[in-house]
Amino acid sequence: MTSAELSDMDALTQVAAIRDGSLSSVEAVEAAIAGAQAVDPALNCIVHERYDRARAEAAAADAAPAAERGPLHGLPVVVKDLDGTLAGEPYWAGSNYLKRLGYVATETSILFQRLIDAGAIIIAKTNTPELGLVPSTEPTSVGPCHNPWDLDRSPGGSSGGSAAAVSAGVVALGHAGDGGGSIRIPASNCGLVGLKPSRDLVPTYPDIDPWGGLVARLGVTRTVADTALLLDVLAGPDNLASPQVRTDRAVSYLASLDGPVGPMRIAWTSAVPGGGTIDPAVAQTVATTAELLADAGHDVVEATPSILTDEAYYGQVIGWFLDAFSVWVRRSVDELEALGGEPVGEGDVEAHTWALRAAGGDVPAHRFAEAVDGLMRVGREGRAFLEKQPYDVLLTPVC
Protein backbone atom coordinates (compact mmCIF):
# COMPACT_ATOMS: atom_id res chain seq x y z
CA MET A 1 0.00 0.00 0.00
CA THR A 2 1.49 3.33 -1.07
CA SER A 3 0.53 6.74 0.24
CA ALA A 4 -0.95 7.55 -3.19
CA GLU A 5 -3.12 4.43 -3.09
CA LEU A 6 -4.28 5.25 0.43
CA SER A 7 -5.15 8.81 -0.56
CA ASP A 8 -7.59 7.45 -3.16
CA MET A 9 -9.59 5.68 -0.43
CA ASP A 10 -12.11 7.37 1.83
CA ALA A 11 -12.41 6.33 5.46
CA LEU A 12 -15.27 3.93 4.86
CA THR A 13 -13.30 2.14 2.14
CA GLN A 14 -10.19 1.89 4.32
CA VAL A 15 -12.15 0.52 7.28
CA ALA A 16 -13.93 -2.01 5.07
CA ALA A 17 -10.62 -3.17 3.58
CA ILE A 18 -9.10 -3.59 7.04
CA ARG A 19 -12.19 -5.49 8.14
CA ASP A 20 -12.09 -7.95 5.23
CA GLY A 21 -8.32 -8.41 5.45
CA SER A 22 -7.39 -6.94 2.08
CA LEU A 23 -5.59 -4.14 3.93
CA SER A 24 -3.91 -4.25 7.32
CA SER A 25 -3.86 -1.40 9.79
CA VAL A 26 -0.06 -1.53 9.71
CA GLU A 27 -0.11 -1.03 5.95
CA ALA A 28 -2.59 1.84 6.21
CA VAL A 29 -0.66 3.56 8.99
CA GLU A 30 2.68 3.15 7.22
CA ALA A 31 1.19 4.63 4.06
CA ALA A 32 -0.25 7.56 6.01
CA ILE A 33 3.08 8.19 7.74
CA ALA A 34 4.89 8.07 4.41
CA GLY A 35 2.38 10.54 3.01
CA ALA A 36 2.84 12.88 5.95
CA GLN A 37 6.61 12.75 5.66
CA ALA A 38 6.39 13.47 1.94
CA VAL A 39 4.14 16.54 2.13
CA ASP A 40 4.84 18.07 5.52
CA PRO A 41 8.10 19.83 4.56
CA ALA A 42 6.02 21.92 2.16
CA LEU A 43 2.75 22.11 4.10
CA ASN A 44 3.89 22.31 7.74
CA CYS A 45 0.64 20.68 8.80
CA ILE A 46 2.13 18.32 11.43
CA VAL A 47 3.33 19.67 14.78
CA HIS A 48 3.64 16.49 16.89
CA GLU A 49 4.44 13.11 15.36
CA ARG A 50 3.17 9.89 16.93
CA TYR A 51 4.62 7.64 14.27
CA ASP A 52 6.29 5.03 16.47
CA ARG A 53 3.33 4.82 18.84
CA ALA A 54 0.95 4.65 15.90
CA ARG A 55 2.91 1.75 14.40
CA ALA A 56 2.67 -0.18 17.66
CA GLU A 57 -1.04 0.60 17.98
CA ALA A 58 -1.62 -0.53 14.39
CA ALA A 59 0.11 -3.85 15.05
CA ALA A 60 -2.08 -4.36 18.11
CA ALA A 61 -5.15 -3.48 16.05
CA ASP A 62 -4.30 -6.13 13.47
CA ALA A 63 -4.02 -8.71 16.24
CA ALA A 64 -7.34 -7.79 17.86
CA PRO A 65 -10.22 -10.27 17.52
CA ALA A 66 -13.21 -9.28 15.43
CA ALA A 67 -15.41 -8.83 18.49
CA GLU A 68 -13.17 -6.01 19.73
CA ARG A 69 -13.10 -4.02 16.49
CA GLY A 70 -14.92 -0.69 16.37
CA PRO A 71 -16.28 1.38 13.47
CA LEU A 72 -12.91 3.09 12.85
CA HIS A 73 -10.78 0.02 13.54
CA GLY A 74 -7.23 0.44 12.30
CA LEU A 75 -7.91 3.74 10.51
CA PRO A 76 -5.10 6.33 10.55
CA VAL A 77 -6.30 9.82 11.54
CA VAL A 78 -4.87 13.14 12.68
CA VAL A 79 -6.08 15.39 15.50
CA LYS A 80 -5.76 19.12 15.96
CA ASP A 81 -3.36 20.36 18.66
CA LEU A 82 -6.30 22.17 20.24
CA ASP A 83 -9.88 21.34 21.20
CA GLY A 84 -8.70 18.16 22.89
CA THR A 85 -5.75 16.56 24.66
CA LEU A 86 -4.03 13.17 24.71
CA ALA A 87 -2.52 12.04 27.99
CA GLY A 88 1.25 11.73 27.72
CA GLU A 89 1.43 13.73 24.48
CA PRO A 90 2.65 17.30 23.89
CA TYR A 91 -0.05 19.97 23.86
CA TRP A 92 0.88 23.47 22.70
CA ALA A 93 -2.40 24.90 21.35
CA GLY A 94 -0.32 26.92 18.91
CA SER A 95 1.25 28.73 21.87
CA ASN A 96 4.88 29.74 22.34
CA TYR A 97 4.28 29.58 26.10
CA LEU A 98 3.35 25.89 26.21
CA LYS A 99 5.99 25.08 23.60
CA ARG A 100 8.68 26.78 25.71
CA LEU A 101 7.62 24.78 28.75
CA GLY A 102 7.44 21.53 26.80
CA TYR A 103 3.98 20.95 28.21
CA VAL A 104 2.65 17.38 28.13
CA ALA A 105 -1.06 16.72 28.68
CA THR A 106 -2.13 14.66 31.67
CA GLU A 107 -5.68 13.86 30.53
CA THR A 108 -7.31 12.43 27.41
CA SER A 109 -10.39 14.33 26.24
CA ILE A 110 -13.65 12.43 25.82
CA LEU A 111 -13.61 13.20 22.12
CA PHE A 112 -10.16 11.69 21.57
CA GLN A 113 -11.00 8.73 23.78
CA ARG A 114 -14.02 8.04 21.60
CA LEU A 115 -11.80 8.03 18.52
CA ILE A 116 -9.44 5.59 20.23
CA ASP A 117 -12.27 3.38 21.51
CA ALA A 118 -13.67 3.24 17.97
CA GLY A 119 -10.32 1.88 16.80
CA ALA A 120 -8.76 4.93 15.16
CA ILE A 121 -4.96 5.21 15.12
CA ILE A 122 -3.83 8.79 15.75
CA ILE A 123 -0.63 9.30 13.76
CA ALA A 124 -0.01 12.99 14.51
CA LYS A 125 -1.29 16.26 15.91
CA THR A 126 -1.80 19.16 13.54
CA ASN A 127 -1.00 22.84 13.23
CA THR A 128 -3.35 25.49 14.62
CA PRO A 129 -3.15 29.22 15.35
CA GLU A 130 -2.56 30.21 18.95
CA LEU A 131 -5.64 29.22 20.98
CA GLY A 132 -7.59 28.97 17.72
CA LEU A 133 -8.27 32.71 17.75
CA VAL A 134 -7.87 33.60 14.06
CA PRO A 135 -9.15 32.18 10.74
CA SER A 136 -5.72 31.37 9.33
CA THR A 137 -3.08 28.95 10.59
CA GLU A 138 0.13 30.95 11.03
CA PRO A 139 1.31 30.58 14.63
CA THR A 140 4.68 32.09 15.46
CA SER A 141 5.36 29.01 17.60
CA VAL A 142 5.75 26.59 14.67
CA GLY A 143 5.26 28.70 11.55
CA PRO A 144 2.52 28.90 8.93
CA CYS A 145 0.65 25.98 7.42
CA HIS A 146 0.22 25.99 3.64
CA ASN A 147 -2.67 24.99 1.41
CA PRO A 148 -2.05 21.81 -0.63
CA TRP A 149 -3.85 23.35 -3.61
CA ASP A 150 -1.61 26.44 -3.63
CA LEU A 151 1.37 26.70 -1.31
CA ASP A 152 1.19 30.50 -1.42
CA ARG A 153 -2.25 30.42 0.18
CA SER A 154 -3.56 29.54 3.62
CA PRO A 155 -5.65 26.46 4.38
CA GLY A 156 -7.64 28.72 6.69
CA GLY A 157 -8.06 28.22 10.39
CA SER A 158 -8.16 27.42 13.03
CA SER A 159 -8.25 23.77 11.93
CA GLY A 160 -5.85 24.46 9.07
CA GLY A 161 -3.37 21.68 9.82
CA SER A 162 -6.04 18.98 9.84
CA ALA A 163 -7.61 20.36 6.66
CA ALA A 164 -4.25 20.46 4.88
CA ALA A 165 -3.46 16.87 5.90
CA VAL A 166 -6.83 15.54 4.72
CA SER A 167 -6.82 17.58 1.52
CA ALA A 168 -3.31 16.33 0.70
CA GLY A 169 -4.50 12.74 1.13
CA VAL A 170 -2.39 11.94 4.18
CA VAL A 171 -5.47 10.67 6.03
CA ALA A 172 -9.19 10.51 5.35
CA LEU A 173 -10.32 11.93 8.71
CA GLY A 174 -8.96 14.92 10.59
CA HIS A 175 -10.29 16.18 13.92
CA ALA A 176 -11.34 19.84 14.00
CA GLY A 177 -13.25 22.34 16.14
CA ASP A 178 -15.27 25.45 15.31
CA GLY A 179 -16.32 28.52 17.28
CA GLY A 180 -16.45 31.16 14.54
CA GLY A 181 -15.69 29.21 11.38
CA SER A 182 -12.73 27.02 12.34
CA ILE A 183 -14.14 23.90 10.66
CA ARG A 184 -16.05 25.60 7.87
CA ILE A 185 -13.34 28.00 6.67
CA PRO A 186 -10.56 25.38 6.28
CA ALA A 187 -13.01 22.99 4.64
CA SER A 188 -13.93 25.67 2.12
CA ASN A 189 -10.31 26.68 1.50
CA CYS A 190 -9.22 23.07 0.99
CA GLY A 191 -12.21 21.61 -0.87
CA LEU A 192 -13.43 19.37 1.97
CA VAL A 193 -16.61 18.50 3.83
CA GLY A 194 -16.69 20.49 7.06
CA LEU A 195 -19.68 20.17 9.38
CA LYS A 196 -19.97 22.26 12.52
CA PRO A 197 -22.39 20.07 14.49
CA SER A 198 -25.26 21.45 16.53
CA ARG A 199 -24.30 22.83 19.92
CA ASP A 200 -23.99 20.20 22.64
CA LEU A 201 -24.17 17.31 20.19
CA VAL A 202 -20.50 16.31 20.68
CA PRO A 203 -19.22 16.56 24.28
CA THR A 204 -16.29 18.90 24.93
CA TYR A 205 -15.15 17.63 28.36
CA PRO A 206 -12.80 18.50 30.04
CA ASP A 207 -13.63 21.91 28.53
CA ILE A 208 -17.00 23.07 29.82
CA ASP A 209 -18.96 25.03 27.20
CA PRO A 210 -15.94 26.79 25.64
CA TRP A 211 -16.75 30.27 24.34
CA GLY A 212 -20.14 30.18 25.99
CA GLY A 213 -21.21 27.15 23.99
CA LEU A 214 -20.24 28.58 20.58
CA VAL A 215 -17.49 25.99 20.08
CA ALA A 216 -18.44 22.64 18.56
CA ARG A 217 -16.10 19.80 17.62
CA LEU A 218 -16.04 17.23 14.87
CA GLY A 219 -13.68 17.07 11.88
CA VAL A 220 -12.95 17.50 8.20
CA THR A 221 -13.25 14.76 5.57
CA ARG A 222 -13.45 14.34 1.81
CA THR A 223 -16.98 12.85 1.72
CA VAL A 224 -20.35 13.38 3.38
CA ALA A 225 -20.45 9.68 4.27
CA ASP A 226 -17.15 9.91 6.15
CA THR A 227 -18.45 12.91 8.08
CA ALA A 228 -21.58 10.94 9.01
CA LEU A 229 -19.38 8.06 10.16
CA LEU A 230 -17.33 10.42 12.33
CA LEU A 231 -20.47 11.95 13.82
CA ASP A 232 -21.75 8.47 14.69
CA VAL A 233 -18.55 7.89 16.66
CA LEU A 234 -18.33 11.24 18.45
CA ALA A 235 -21.91 12.38 19.10
CA GLY A 236 -23.85 11.58 22.24
CA PRO A 237 -23.91 12.22 25.98
CA ASP A 238 -21.27 11.39 28.56
CA ASN A 239 -21.54 11.35 32.33
CA LEU A 240 -18.69 13.87 32.68
CA ALA A 241 -19.89 16.18 29.92
CA SER A 242 -22.37 19.02 29.93
CA PRO A 243 -25.84 17.87 31.02
CA GLN A 244 -27.18 19.58 27.90
CA VAL A 245 -25.51 17.12 25.50
CA ARG A 246 -28.28 15.94 23.21
CA THR A 247 -29.58 12.38 23.25
CA ASP A 248 -32.30 12.55 20.57
CA ARG A 249 -30.67 10.30 17.97
CA ALA A 250 -32.81 7.38 16.84
CA VAL A 251 -30.65 6.03 14.00
CA SER A 252 -27.09 6.21 12.78
CA TYR A 253 -26.18 9.33 10.81
CA LEU A 254 -24.40 7.11 8.30
CA ALA A 255 -27.41 4.82 7.90
CA SER A 256 -29.68 7.82 7.44
CA LEU A 257 -27.83 8.74 4.24
CA ASP A 258 -29.58 5.83 2.53
CA GLY A 259 -33.02 7.08 3.52
CA PRO A 260 -35.40 9.01 1.26
CA VAL A 261 -34.96 12.76 0.90
CA GLY A 262 -38.25 14.42 0.07
CA PRO A 263 -38.45 17.80 -1.63
CA MET A 264 -36.98 20.42 0.71
CA ARG A 265 -37.71 24.12 0.93
CA ILE A 266 -34.35 25.83 0.56
CA ALA A 267 -33.54 29.52 1.02
CA TRP A 268 -30.41 30.84 -0.61
CA THR A 269 -28.49 34.10 -0.54
CA SER A 270 -25.14 35.40 -1.69
CA ALA A 271 -25.25 38.24 0.85
CA VAL A 272 -22.55 38.41 3.50
CA PRO A 273 -22.71 40.04 6.95
CA GLY A 274 -22.39 43.79 7.19
CA GLY A 275 -23.04 44.45 3.53
CA GLY A 276 -19.62 43.18 2.47
CA THR A 277 -18.76 41.87 -0.97
CA ILE A 278 -17.67 38.44 -2.15
CA ASP A 279 -15.75 37.30 -5.17
CA PRO A 280 -18.03 37.08 -8.22
CA ALA A 281 -16.96 33.47 -8.76
CA VAL A 282 -18.18 32.57 -5.27
CA ALA A 283 -21.49 34.35 -5.81
CA GLN A 284 -21.94 32.49 -9.10
CA THR A 285 -21.16 29.17 -7.43
CA VAL A 286 -23.85 29.77 -4.81
CA ALA A 287 -26.37 30.68 -7.51
CA THR A 288 -25.42 27.64 -9.60
CA THR A 289 -25.81 25.38 -6.57
CA ALA A 290 -29.28 26.82 -5.99
CA GLU A 291 -30.18 26.06 -9.61
CA LEU A 292 -28.93 22.48 -9.30
CA LEU A 293 -31.01 21.97 -6.16
CA ALA A 294 -34.08 23.33 -7.93
CA ASP A 295 -33.43 21.01 -10.87
CA ALA A 296 -33.32 18.13 -8.37
CA GLY A 297 -36.90 18.89 -7.37
CA HIS A 298 -36.46 21.08 -4.30
CA ASP A 299 -38.39 24.30 -3.65
CA VAL A 300 -35.61 26.90 -3.85
CA VAL A 301 -36.19 30.59 -3.13
CA GLU A 302 -33.86 33.56 -2.72
CA ALA A 303 -34.26 34.92 0.81
CA THR A 304 -31.87 36.71 3.14
CA PRO A 305 -31.89 36.88 6.97
CA SER A 306 -31.95 40.43 8.32
CA ILE A 307 -28.57 40.11 10.01
CA LEU A 308 -26.99 39.92 6.56
CA THR A 309 -28.65 43.12 5.33
CA ASP A 310 -28.98 45.33 8.42
CA GLU A 311 -25.52 46.88 8.75
CA ALA A 312 -26.34 48.70 11.99
CA TYR A 313 -27.55 45.51 13.65
CA TYR A 314 -24.54 43.60 12.37
CA GLY A 315 -22.29 46.24 13.94
CA GLN A 316 -24.05 45.67 17.24
CA VAL A 317 -23.52 41.92 16.89
CA ILE A 318 -19.81 42.46 16.26
CA GLY A 319 -19.66 44.61 19.40
CA TRP A 320 -21.26 41.84 21.41
CA PHE A 321 -18.86 39.30 19.98
CA LEU A 322 -15.75 41.39 20.71
CA ASP A 323 -16.84 41.99 24.31
CA ALA A 324 -17.53 38.32 24.93
CA PHE A 325 -14.58 37.10 22.87
CA SER A 326 -12.04 39.24 24.72
CA VAL A 327 -13.30 37.92 28.07
CA TRP A 328 -13.09 34.35 26.79
CA VAL A 329 -9.54 35.00 25.55
CA ARG A 330 -8.56 36.37 28.95
CA ARG A 331 -9.91 33.20 30.51
CA SER A 332 -8.00 31.09 27.96
CA VAL A 333 -4.73 32.82 28.84
CA ASP A 334 -5.47 32.24 32.54
CA GLU A 335 -5.95 28.56 31.68
CA LEU A 336 -2.54 28.56 29.97
CA GLU A 337 -1.02 29.83 33.21
CA ALA A 338 -2.78 27.09 35.15
CA LEU A 339 -1.38 24.45 32.81
CA GLY A 340 2.14 25.85 32.75
CA GLY A 341 2.42 26.88 36.38
CA GLU A 342 4.18 30.13 35.44
CA PRO A 343 2.87 33.64 34.73
CA VAL A 344 2.18 34.38 31.06
CA GLY A 345 4.08 37.48 30.01
CA GLU A 346 3.58 39.69 26.99
CA GLY A 347 6.36 37.90 25.12
CA ASP A 348 4.84 34.47 25.78
CA VAL A 349 1.83 34.96 23.50
CA GLU A 350 1.22 36.64 20.17
CA ALA A 351 0.40 40.35 20.03
CA HIS A 352 -3.28 39.90 19.19
CA THR A 353 -3.71 37.41 22.03
CA TRP A 354 -2.13 39.80 24.51
CA ALA A 355 -4.27 42.70 23.27
CA LEU A 356 -7.47 40.67 23.53
CA ARG A 357 -6.48 39.50 27.00
CA ALA A 358 -6.02 43.11 28.10
CA ALA A 359 -9.33 44.15 26.53
CA GLY A 360 -11.10 41.34 28.33
CA GLY A 361 -10.09 42.84 31.66
CA ASP A 362 -11.88 46.07 30.76
CA VAL A 363 -15.28 44.49 30.03
CA PRO A 364 -17.58 44.89 33.06
CA ALA A 365 -19.69 41.94 34.13
CA HIS A 366 -23.00 43.46 33.06
CA ARG A 367 -21.66 44.15 29.55
CA PHE A 368 -20.32 40.62 29.24
CA ALA A 369 -23.71 39.22 30.25
CA GLU A 370 -25.40 41.50 27.71
CA ALA A 371 -22.97 40.34 25.02
CA VAL A 372 -23.56 36.64 25.68
CA ASP A 373 -27.31 37.18 25.70
CA GLY A 374 -27.06 39.11 22.43
CA LEU A 375 -25.11 36.32 20.75
CA MET A 376 -27.66 33.77 21.91
CA ARG A 377 -30.37 36.03 20.49
CA VAL A 378 -28.69 35.92 17.08
CA GLY A 379 -28.92 32.14 17.18
CA ARG A 380 -32.59 32.29 18.09
CA GLU A 381 -33.23 34.73 15.24
CA GLY A 382 -31.54 32.37 12.82
CA ARG A 383 -33.81 29.57 13.98
CA ALA A 384 -36.84 31.86 13.66
CA PHE A 385 -35.88 32.67 10.05
CA LEU A 386 -35.85 28.98 9.21
CA GLU A 387 -39.10 28.18 11.01
CA LYS A 388 -41.17 31.13 9.81
CA GLN A 389 -41.59 29.96 6.20
CA PRO A 390 -40.45 27.26 7.03
CA TYR A 391 -37.12 26.54 5.37
CA ASP A 392 -35.22 23.29 5.77
CA VAL A 393 -31.88 24.75 4.66
CA LEU A 394 -30.24 28.15 4.24
CA LEU A 395 -27.60 28.09 1.49
CA THR A 396 -24.90 30.78 1.80
CA PRO A 397 -21.26 31.42 0.91
CA VAL A 398 -18.82 30.16 3.54
CA CYS A 399 -18.21 32.81 6.20
Spell out what each predicted region is.
Residues 147-159, 200-207, 326-343:
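Short, basic, helix/turn surface patches
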Residues 155-174, 214, 218-221, 336-359:
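Electropositive, surface-exposed helix/loop patches at the edges of structured domains
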Residues 92-94, 124-125, 211-212, 267-271, ...:
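Short beta-strands and strand-loop turn motifs
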Residues 2-179, 291, 386-388:
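Gly/Ser-rich catalytic/binding loops embedded in alpha/beta enzyme cores
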Residues 108, 192, 283-287:
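Amphipathic alpha-helical segments in well-structured domains
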